[in-house]
A protein has these predicted regions:
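Gly/Ser/Thr/Pro-rich low-complexity, intrinsically disordered segments
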Residues: 1-184
C-alpha cells in the first residue's frame, strides 16, 4: 500500500507539526485529523519514549529537538508558502529533519543515519517536487538508499526520510490509510 501526492504551495493553508503529547497510536490518526481539521496526516521524525525528538524539529516557533549539529531539512513559515529545504537549524517557524536523501535535485551519495534507521522497512518521506509540497508513505520495504533512488528517479527536488518501520502511518479524510503496527 502506498500514498503519495504533490500539492502546489498556493493550495496549502498550513503544514502542521503535531506534537503528539496525547500519545495517539499509529492506528488512531483519525483522532488527530478531527482535532486539527487537517486533510491528511502521516508520521514524522524519530522520538524517544519520553517524547523527546531525536532530530531537529520545530513547530509553530517551539523547538522540540535541537541536536548539536547542522543538517539539511524541510522548513516553512506559518502559511507554508516558503516551504523548502534549508540548512538546519534556521529561523523558520517550522522545520523537520531526519535523514536527508535529495538536496537541490541531487541524490546524496551517502545519506547520514544511525544503523537502526537502515535495512529494508516501510518508509515515509516529505520534500518538494517541481516546487510543490510532496510526500510519500509506503508499506514497500526500502533501504534509505533505495528510497533515495526512487524519489530522485521520480523527480523530487528535495527529500527527507522520516521515521520508518512500525512508525509508518497515513490517514486522510476519506478514511484511506494504514498503520503498520496495530499493537503499538
Amino acid at each position: 500500500m502506498q500514498f503519495a501526492a504533490t500539492y502546489p504551495l498556493a493550495q496549502i493553508r498550513r503544514v502542521q507539526i503535531y506534537n503528539n503529547i496525547k500519545r495517539y497510536r499509529e492506528t488512531e490518526l483519525d483522532k488527530i485529523l478531527q482535532e486539527t481539521g487537517g486533510s491528511f496526516v502521516f508520521g514524522g521524525p524519530i522520538y524517544l519514549g519520553n517524547l523527546t525528538a531525536c532530530c531537529h524539529l520545530k513547530g509553530d516557533g517551539v523547538v522540540y529537538g535541537a541536536p548539536d549539529y547542522h543538517v539539511w531539512g524541510m522548513a516553512w513559515g506559518t502559511d507554508a508558502q516558503d516551504y523548502a529545504m534549508e540548512w538546519l537549524p534556521c529561523g523558520a517557524d517550522n522545520y523537520v529533519e531526519c535523514v536527508a536523501l535529495v538536496v537541490e535535485g541531487e541524490p546524496l551519495a551517502a545519506p547520514h543515519y544511525q544503523p537502526d534507521m537502515g535495512g529494508r522497512r516501510p518508509r515515509q518521506a516529505i520534500g518538494t517536487k517541481e516546487g510543490r509540497f510532496a510526500y510519500l508513505v509506503t508499506q514497500t520495504p526500502y533501504t534509505p538508499e533505495e528510497l533515495r533512488d526512487v524519489l530522485a528517479a521520480a523527480g523530487w527536488d528535495s527529500a527527507v526520510m522520516l521515521d520508518g518501520g512500525g512508525s509508518v502511518c497515513y490517514r486522510d479524510r476519506a478514511g484511506n490509510g494504514t498503520g503498520t503496527t496495530p499493537a503499538r
